């Protein structure tokens, strides 16, 4: 991610005072209104940046959970149907695998938005 550090904060903009001169300058109300807009934009940007960080952390967590679930599915998958002694055990394992695969699918949708 590129460096998004800002030179000014909303507080810096709000507290900025311009030197007053006797010569004709800009209308104070117009400058204040413009600075208010800039402050609002800076605050929105800071809020959006915080949201991006939060979503990035959540995305990382979900990817890790997805990988763990894939590993569990891979290790719990039966190598051969003969290794199970009863149909009940096979049915329970198959049902459990289907549940895990559904969860993986839901996590993929949440992480990748598909």
UniProtKB/Swiss-Prot annotation:
A biological process term (GO) from this entry: regulation of cell shape
Assembly information from the UniProt record: Forms polymers through the coiled coil domains. Interacts with PBP1, MreC and EzrA.
InterPro entries: Cell_cycle_GpsB, DivIVA_domain, DivIVA_fam
GO cellular component terms given for this protein: cytoplasm
Any coiled-coil regions, as ranges: 42-77
PANTHER family per record: CELL CYCLE PROTEIN GPSB, CELL DIVISION PROTEIN DIVIVA
Lineage: Bacteria, Bacillati, Bacillota, Bacilli, Bacillales
Function: Divisome component that associates with the complex late in its assembly, after the Z-ring is formed, and is dependent on DivIC and PBP2B for its recruitment to the divisome. Together with EzrA, is a key component of the system that regulates PBP1 localization during cell cycle progression. Its main role could be the removal of PBP1 from the cell pole after pole maturation is completed. Also contributes to the recruitment of PBP1 to the division complex. Not essential for septum formation.
Organism per entry: Staphylococcus aureus (strain NCTC 8325 / PS 47)
Protein name: Cell cycle protein GpsB
Superkingdom classification of source: Bacteria
Region feature (Disordered): 74-99
Gene: gpsB
Entry's localization field: Cytoplasm
Keyword Transmembrane helix: no
């Amino acid at each position: 991610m590129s460096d998004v550090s800002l030179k000014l904060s909303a507080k810096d903009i709000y507290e900025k005072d311009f030197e007053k001169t006797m010569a004709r300058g800009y209308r104070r109300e117009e400058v204040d209104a413009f600075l208010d807009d800039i402050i609002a934009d800076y605050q929105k940007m800071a809020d959006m940046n915080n949201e991006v960080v939060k979503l990035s952390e959540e995305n990382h967590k979900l990817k890790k959970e997805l990988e763990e679930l894939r590993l569990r599915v891979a290790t719990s998958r039966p190598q051969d149907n003969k290794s199970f002694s009863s149909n009940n055990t096979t049915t329970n394992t198959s049902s459990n695998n289907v549940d895990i695969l559904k969860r993986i699918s839901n996590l993929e949708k949440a992480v990748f938005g598909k």
